Amino acid sequence: MLGRVKTNAVAAVRGIGRPATGSAAFMSDRLSPSIGNIALEFRPGLTATERARFAVQDVAGGLRLWRLAWTLGWLDIRLRYRGSLLGPFWLTLSTAIMVSSLGVLYATLMHMDVHRYLPFIALSQVLWGFISGVVGDGCVCFTQAEGIIRSVRMPLFVQVLRVLVRNLLMLGHNAVVIVVVFALFSVRPGWQALWALPGVAAWALAAAAICLPLGAVCARFRDVPQIVGSVMQIAFFLTPIIWLPDQLGPHEHLLLLNPFFDLLEIVREPLLGTAAGSHIWMAAVAITLVLCGFSCALFARVRGRVAFWL
């Protein structure tokens, strides 16, 4: 099964960069006018409008190749756990051990009700794992795909979608921990959980928006991933993951200054049975829009140089 998937993925990647015949020619004709060899274009004389147009074509071409991105992301997971007995569920098992040990320990140290704290930390750990995974993988989304980018006609945005797919699959595996903990402690979010769906959509948009500039900057400056990793470690402790927001008391409003908190709350609160406040949503939407604007501007500026930085 793995061999067939790998063969199909390799064939799909190779098929983008070589002339097609027969039925494949029809697909090539449909894709090539829009995506072309856009990953390897570098024209110093381009105007800002032309750079923006090529960047939009790159994103649009990547979205049209979502099946390839899905296959590559799934293949990354399969290859990472090749030969393993539990496969990706090793990550689920390690998350479950972390949640149970930290949950009992911190509930005892901070004198909190374990029935309230354990579901909170289980959900927080899993959701934070997705956020930190996207940021970490986004830093290397282009450098790890160096061979493909430098040799195959493919939009750069495919590598961003690949990161998103890979982390969504890992989030799906870790969601088992949330389901089990919620069942053990009789947590029933009710219809409020539906508010998590637009939150996940906002997450996907923000994830794509953060991966593009991070991938480009880290391709140019190879020390940036280590800096980002250190920042994420600090953000873990500054964000209510292992501690509750109401523990700040009268200073709880300061959490709004933490962008990770705003994005985390629009998914976490509905799954805990309470809808996030309007001020949380406004902050999360504002953060997402700012990320998208910054990402578009930077990607349009440096997109043509990425392949030469690898």
Predicted segments with their positions:
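Hydrophobic transmembrane alpha-helices and immediately adjacent juxtamembrane helices
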Residues: R4, N8, I16-G17, T21-L310
